[in-house]
């Protein structure tokens, strides 16, 4: 499914803020000081059914589907509220860059993307605002979950040592997941029996995606339980511990965690791939907007730096030392040293990945301020000790992040005021 089509399902939360008023619309759910309207739920259902029809995917009964959609809308609303609470704002520059990336990933121009969105009954402005909201929610979630993650140096060293003993090859798995969640007062043995019954049905040929839609309470339930392609090192620990050398089509489980019982299916496996790290040596000049220096002023000043460098009036290093507000690199003529692009924020990463060597970028904005950057060199690096430690840290971070984000969402949901309004209350 195209990226923008997946995002259409997100065009639900507080939909009344960006769409035309709907006659006799009703409040379906109260979430803290916000609401989810019945039209939001109806739009989500319509979109999901349309996408399922196009892909030939079976959906569960209407009641089960409605419950899954309402659960997702509640979580989406809470994340949007968290973004508002901590003051996350996505400006037009970052928004435009994100939409351009969506278009590139779909091999479309912006006009083609806009036309495709319109064919789904969504205006381009509605789409833009939803992407802005999705970005803000994602940024808030990432920031708040990162604070909860602690990685000890010994953990990094131990994992780096293990990785260094492996070959350059790694196997990727496409994983399907069903989670049956414990609830207060529930008989855990009854839940285990249900999980075993589902496993038997799956082994007899039941469709995994349909079973996930119907029964799963996991984070990918509305995607039919599909976690996509992952190496073991990228998976949540509870997944990785269960996967040994099983073949495509294997059903694994049920197995128990602190939140419930889990069932996995290996939808597909693809083989060995060589691990090679591309490192980029770049230098930059950073200007931070202030009350005195506006965004436009920062852009003008950086454009003047570019002119002076090209005219031979000053070198990049001289200007970085004199003007850059990144103290760590300014003293080094703006040079950042060899780094993997993944270590940078998305906008900066895009620049250092795509700029030709020796080319200075146009001014661009990140969360840190306004930059110009020049790529000095690129190199391919094998498994050096430094690369292994960077990789080990990313693996540990991703693993803990995937585990912690679920716990954070549960806590967010548990601490929220949520009231589902039934028809009688609306009619009354």
Swiss-Prot record:
<dbReference type="InterPro" id="IPR027304">
    <property type="entry name" value="Trigger_fact/SurA_dom_sf"/>
</dbReference>
<feature type="domain" description="PpiC 2">
    <location>
        <begin position="277"/>
        <end position="377"/>
    </location>
</feature>
<keyword id="KW-0574">Periplasm</keyword>
<dbReference type="GO" id="GO:0050821">
    <property type="term" value="P:protein stabilization"/>
</dbReference>
<dbReference type="GO" id="GO:0051082">
    <property type="term" value="F:unfolded protein binding"/>
</dbReference>
<keyword id="KW-0697">Rotamase</keyword>
<keyword id="KW-0732">Signal</keyword>
<keyword id="KW-0143">Chaperone</keyword>
<dbReference type="GO" id="GO:0003755">
    <property type="term" value="F:peptidyl-prolyl cis-trans isomerase activity"/>
</dbReference>
<dbReference type="GO" id="GO:0030288">
    <property type="term" value="C:outer membrane-bounded periplasmic space"/>
</dbReference>
<dbReference type="InterPro" id="IPR023034">
    <property type="entry name" value="PPIase_SurA"/>
</dbReference>
<feature type="signal peptide">
    <location>
        <begin position="1"/>
        <end position="19"/>
    </location>
</feature>
<dbReference type="InterPro" id="IPR050280">
    <property type="entry name" value="OMP_Chaperone_SurA"/>
</dbReference>
<dbReference type="InterPro" id="IPR000297">
    <property type="entry name" value="PPIase_PpiC"/>
</dbReference>
<dbReference type="Pfam" id="PF09312">
    <property type="entry name" value="SurA_N"/>
</dbReference>
<keyword id="KW-0677">Repeat</keyword>
<dbReference type="GO" id="GO:0043165">
    <property type="term" value="P:Gram-negative-bacterium-type cell outer membrane assembly"/>
</dbReference>
<dbReference type="GO" id="GO:0042277">
    <property type="term" value="F:peptide binding"/>
</dbReference>
<dbReference type="InterPro" id="IPR046357">
    <property type="entry name" value="PPIase_dom_sf"/>
</dbReference>
<comment type="function">
    <text>Chaperone involved in the correct folding and assembly of outer membrane proteins. Recognizes specific patterns of aromatic residues and the orientation of their side chains, which are found more frequently in integral outer membrane proteins. May act in both early periplasmic and late outer membrane-associated steps of protein maturation.</text>
</comment>
<dbReference type="GO" id="GO:0006457">
    <property type="term" value="P:protein folding"/>
</dbReference>
<protein>
    <recommendedName>
        <fullName>Chaperone SurA</fullName>
        <ecNumber>5.2.1.8</ecNumber>
    </recommendedName>
</protein>
<dbReference type="InterPro" id="IPR015391">
    <property type="entry name" value="SurA_N"/>
</dbReference>
<dbReference type="Pfam" id="PF13616">
    <property type="entry name" value="Rotamase_3"/>
</dbReference>
<keyword id="KW-0413">Isomerase</keyword>
<feature type="domain" description="PpiC 1">
    <location>
        <begin position="170"/>
        <end position="268"/>
    </location>
</feature>
